[in-house]
Structure formats: C-alpha cells, structure tokens
C-alpha cells in the first residue's frame, strides 16, 4: 500500500515536471502572444503556480488525507531578490527562501530536506536558501547579500502567519547598520557627477542602465522606510508621469532580455541580435526609419532613462542620510546667482528648485563660468524637467548659439544630452538620439559620437592641429563647433548618402542661428565631405596628382582644407580613439601638406574641379545607375582628367563599357565625313607606325586618354577619308601597323625652339610637353616615334590642327629615364 502511494506521488511529480518542460518549450509562443508585454509578470505567476503544485504534492505525500491548513504548518515559500521584485526574464534564476519555525509538533526539517530535493530535480532554476525565523536576525544582520535579497519579499505559498513573522525580522535587519547597506548599493550608481556613454552592444542585466541597476535601486527604496512602498518612496522626488515612463522602460528591457534569452540564449544585445529580435518581437518600423534601428534605439533610450532615473532617485533620497562635509559658510560660498551650487568643479541643483522655462534654463547655463564643469545628477534632472513652450523654445534656440562661443561648450552640451534635451534644442538631432551604428568602427551611438567629437575639438592633443584651430577667428571656431556637433545629422533617415542629407539639414538649422552666409556655405561643404579626408588618406594614393586634385577640387580653398583637417581629427577620435594612431596622423598630415601646396596650381585645380562636376552629373545619369557597381567604381578611377573635360556623361559611360569588356585591341572605323579611327587597347602599341602609314590622310586631331586598369582610348581624326570598299583593308592596315615591331623613321619636321615647351616638373606624376608649330604631314608620326624610341609612356594627349597650326599637348608618365633624358627629347624634336 505504501509502495503504491509512493509510486503515485512520484508519478504526480513527474507530471508537474512534464508540464513545466512543456511550458518552457512553449515560452516563445507565450512571449509573442502579447509581443512580450508584461512577460515578466506572466513568468512570475506561472513559476509561483509550479511551486505551489510541488508544495501541495509534497504535503499530500507527508500527511496523506490529514494535510494541515497552510497557516497551521509553520513553513513558507517566499520569493526573494529579483524574483520578489518581478525582474525576471526567460533565463532567470529563481531565488527563494524556505523559512520555517522549529516546532516540536512537526518533523519539519525532514520535510524541508525532501521539498528542497524535489525543487532541485524539477528542471526549474532555483537558488534556495533556508532560514529558521527566530535565527534570521542573529545569523544575517551583517550579511549584506542576504539583506539585499530579502529587502523585498513576496509570499508564494505556505503559512501567511509565518510570512508576517519573517517580515518583522527582515525589518529589524534592515534597520541594523542601515548606512552600510545604503553605501553597498549606492556604489552601483557612483559617481553621481558622471553619466557614462552607452555601450552599443550592452549586457541588459549588468550594463549601464540595465536590470541590475533597477535591483540596486529597489533594495535602496525598500531599506529607507519599511512602512512605505517602493512607489511611494519614488513619488517623494518624482511625479506620476515620470514613474510611468520609468516603468515602461523597465518593462521593455525585461521583454527584450527575454527575447534575447529565447532566441540566442544570451543577456547581451549585439549587432547579430538586431534582425533576430526585431522579427521575434514583431517590431514595426517608423516613418523614415527601418525596423532594425527601431529596436536598438528603443533599447538604448530605455537604458539611458533607467540610468538617469535610478541615479536621481537614489541620490535624492539617500543624501539626507549622509552628513555634508562642507560647513555652512562653505555651502553659502558655493551657491551661485542662478541658484545652482558649484562644489569642486561639480554643478548641483537643490531638489526644491522649481523647473525653469527652457529659455531661462539656457540663460542659467550661460551664466556659469566658462569652465569644464561636471554636472551632478540633480542638475541633469533639473535640466530634464525644463518647461517648454513653442515661443519659449524659439527664444531658447536664439540664445543657445552662445554656448558654442564658449571655450568649454562640451560640458553643457553633454549635460543637455544626458537630460535628453539636446534633440529639443537641435531638432535635427532627434532622429539620431540613441541611434546605434553597428559598422565595426563606431564605439558609441550617433548622438554620443557627435557630442564626443566636440570634446575632442576642445581638447586637441595634436600640437599642429591645435595651432590650426587657435588661428581661427571666433566665428570660424563657432561654426566649426556647430558643424562638429551636427556632422552626422543626416543618419537615420533611410537614405544612403547621409553626408549630403546632413549638409542640407545643417543649412536650414544654421540659418535659425543667424550664422553668416559665408560660414553656412563653408559648414555645408564640411558636413558634405566630413569623411572625405579620412577616406582619401586611408584608401587612396595621396601621392597621386589625380587623387590630390580630385580631393581639393571638392573643397574649393585652403581655409576649408584647414577646417576639414581639424574636423577629421575630431571625428576619427570620437569614432574610436584607437583609430587615431601615429600612422593615421602621419597620413592625414601628409595629405594636408600635399593638398595645401596643390592649391597654388590654378590650372590643374580648375581641371580637377570640372572633373568633379562631371562626376556628379554621371552619378545622376540613368545609364550609370543601371551599370554594375564594379563598373561604376571603375569610371571614377579613370586616370585622365581630360576625358571628363571633353566628353558628356553618356559618352564617358559608353567608353567605359567598351573598355571594361576589352580582351585585346579593338578598332572602330568611321568614314562618314572623314576618316576617324577609335582604338581601345590594354597593351603598348606602335602608334608611330600607324601615323606613318596614314600620314597621307592628313591628321587633323588626335587624343590619347588613359582610362582604368592600364587601358587606353585613342582617337585619330583625319582631314581625308577613304573609299568605302577600302574600309576593311584600312582596318587591317591599322591593326598591322599598331602591332608592328618595326620602328619607322619619319622625316624630321621643322619645329622651332620657341614652338616647344617641356615641363619636367609639371606635377609629381607627370611631365608636360606642348608643341605649337606649323602643320606638317608626318609631324605626329615623328613625335610618337621619338616617344617610342625613348620608351616614354604617354598617358594623355590632345592634338588639334587649326588654320595650318598644330597644337599638341602630352602628359608623360615621370620616371628616372624621363628625368635623365629630358634634354634628349628637345634635341630630337627641335630642328634648329
């Protein structure tokens, strides 16, 4: 009979366990049913029910049909720690206290032992502590961990009378050495004058603004006054709306933590979590914002709020328990005109100071000395509570500009960021607030990165760059500071080209601040190209003339170059300080110096500027947009600037298509009005031989352009044409001549000394040869034969004959041979 009962009990325990395992397997469905809302309360209720089932079954096993009433059996199961505070996620441990009263009438220790073993084998994650009610105070009064875990208890099952006795004992240990307990939990929030930057991939439990901070806050609130609820304690320093906002943030973080537990078995949110959790939580996108950024932005915003609110409540309620080290006279001296207090470089605001109008708040901040202050959490919350009206905000924005006139703007801007007021004063920053960037480079969110950029601007360590900044006028420094803060405002709006979007946004906002038109125009260029200097220095050949002139042509003048150099330093450091190393600094400095010198060559700068404009036109061309991305990139790597000067966007695209598909030399002949030969090649050709053979057709125009991947485009236009039946033979002759290894020796033309100009140092990469002479048959064949004989590579050429005069321009690739044989070129070409 006893064996049958034991088997039956065992079977009942197994059924409870199976039910739990089924419940656990279906947790994702339970979560998605309400999109994770109130999921922590759902978990607590379900776990409570399983514990009750196990207790009821154990009671039946021990007492059979004589089960005593709950209150008659001196045993209770109480939730402690985060389980009691309902701070649960799917992977949470369940901390419980099994409490009993040692009575002679029951063999309760034997019951406790078996019940504990049953719970341990249940498959649930229990952390069990056992205590005898009369021994709680003596055993645990100095145990800060136990005092923390039991600072809030929640009855699950068992004797309620015993539960009330336990609460009385817990109140006693709370009162014992209360300051030590408060200090223990306050450490989690210190210092109150430093709000950390948010990690983009935070641990939702232990990270800044995570669940552990809520736990520490609850422990503090539960200790302050046992007769007052946690909510009532918080209401002493916060209003209903603020508490409701705080609770929503907590609930979202707990839901997100469960989503991470259920989908990836982790407590840490990472770049890889974004898509998975977004889909799992069925997060919907907002206007101009994709689904992926919504969830990370909401998470980081919630963590920021939890961190700010928790610190404010903890500081406000705990400070009265600790005597100030300042004397009355010292406190009096620390008080400022605006009602703030400045103590050891930290700004404090009394709790009783009423919230200010937004325009008055800005003036109060401007009254502070131009010093790199820190702002206590009391000051942050005072800023957060500013009263905002439409007219008041307009007045505040007009005064807000003055913050940028200060040498130490960062401290105030950081306090406005922490109070989430910066996006109200700078509306364009609203969509980048707590916007994460999972690109492998950015350490912080977009808004924090922007504020941090200002910090690096005001604390430049590079002496050379610091001197450049010191040389700026006040308006230049002010404009650059605003640009530095707003350089990324184009992000988060759904477009790929955040720099151009940001430049347009800056223009509109800068007009509100009444910056001069010149300052606004420069600011627009800086934001439009704020990544350019870094990209060029790291990814391109900064010793290439083409690269340098393409770079500076976008900037326009030396002053913009200087400002961009300073801005690049700040942005790179704010992205991740490890990125600005000695190598990066050297590249940026060299790019700056080379570019500064290049501004003196106005002709080449004008050529490069025209190229940039043509490139912009190509980018908008529908034919270009239809090309493969690889070919699009190749077009902008065309070496010759002259291609962009001479040809239309469509013509450049067509040239590039042919060159891209080229396997060997291709020749195209047109004979409509006169003979025209187009040659595409990826190897050296005997062009002088072709010109020798075709001299009778009278060359009128020739151009040679280097395209990309060492491919060349050559065009020859003659004054004469050929008979149509001779076209095929003409093409065969052209190909034969080009591939010939025979060096022809055309008759030397008459070129006077004053008709030729050779610039060996035209640029770092190229020498330039110009000929302006009388047109003579075979002249170009002879010139090209000289180049072939001396093994010089022509990268660009333009030859035109007008009114019996031939005007020739050649760009020749510089090398040691060219530098040593410069005089020989002239001797071979000049007939005198």
Q: Would you name each region that the model predicts?
A:
Residues 3, 10, 176-320:
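Conserved nucleotidyltransferase catalytic core and NTase-mimicking acidic/glycine-rich helix/loop elements
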